[in-house]
């Protein structure tokens, strides 16, 4: 089983995260960050990506949600990197284009060990669900850098809830594809022989 448990404790946050990349039925998803809209987004990402995810996070929400969301990205990225190991047998690449009513999001991923993020699109408002919309890019940046994932995310929409949800679902589906094991493959998906 490709699983990882990562804990992060700082003066700003206390996070325990467990991820399982190999599909189980029913999915084991429990997200508790103290930020209900963010919980909803991460749950959608996990469910549509087909991986188990349990997050318990306590952060300095009396300040704002920045530290909590950033640190969850760091911990999730670290857990993904650990669960993938050397990447032997994975598809490595994944993509998804997901609509949600008027919103459309595209996510293209390479789990090749090089952390990078391109995040293109604009939200109509500065906040959605009580979250500063700039934190979505920051979350995915933190995740990608610590997981060693290159991600290109593009989006458009008029309703920011729909737009955010389409982004998280697209990322989850693309990630689920990229980490899928190719049957009977024991190869590291790189011409270099390493990710």
Curated annotation (Swiss-Prot):
Which residue windows are coiled coil?
none
Keyword Ribonucleoprotein in annotation: no
Instruction: State the Gene Ontology BP annotations.
Output: L-histidine biosynthetic process
This protein's pathway: Amino-acid biosynthesis; L-histidine biosynthesis; L-histidine from 5-phospho-alpha-D-ribose 1-diphosphate: step 6/9
Presence of keyword Nucleotide-binding: no
Reading the lineage from the top rank, the first entry is: Archaea
Question: A single Gene Ontology molecular function, please?
Answer: imidazoleglycerol-phosphate dehydratase activity
GO CC annotations, alphabetized: cytoplasm
Cell location: Cytoplasm
Question: What family is this?
Answer: Belongs to the imidazoleglycerol-phosphate dehydratase family.
Under what name is this protein listed?
Imidazoleglycerol-phosphate dehydratase
What organism is the protein native to? Methanosphaerula palustris (strain ATCC BAA-1556 / DSM 19958 / E1-9c)
What lineage is on file? Archaea, Methanobacteriati, Methanobacteriota, Stenosarchaea group, Methanomicrobia
Q: Gene name?
A: hisB
